[in-house]
Amino acid sequence: MVGGEATSAVEKLVSGVRQAADFAEQFRSYSESEKQWKARMEFILRHLPDYRDPPDGGGRLDQLLSLSMVWANHLFLGCSYNKDLLDKVMEMADGIEVEDLPQFTSRSELMKKHQS
């Protein structure tokens, strides 16, 4: 019955992934595009086991959601943040593939062009 056990294991895995995605869906912002949400959801799901709230609370999940927004805002909107914070979220997002990102010009880059 190895085939039956393998099928059961796959069904459990698929069910677990579906439950995790359904859980994460509640955190989607109404203003997020499908592309932004898929990237942020991957960020959340990747780190969810490390940021589950302990039974007495603690706000770990809120921290993860905030980090996911920092990453998404930097990536998709060009927002800038403290270097340590940005380094942390970029490290957390390592390996998440996002295509066709917008290109942003910083204020200092604009000033350099203007002064030339």
UniProtKB/Swiss-Prot annotation:
The keyword Acetylation applies. Keywords: Acetylation. Pfam families: XTBD. InterPro entries: XTBD. It comes from the Eukaryota. The modification N-acetylmethionine is found at M1. Residues 24-116 form the XRN2-binding (XTBD) domain. The keyword Kinase does not apply. Signal peptide: none annotated. Belongs to the CARF family. Interacts with XRN2; the interaction is direct. This is CDKN2AIP N-terminal-like protein. The lineage of its organism: Eukaryota, Metazoa, Chordata, Craniata, Vertebrata. The gene is Cdkn2aipnl.
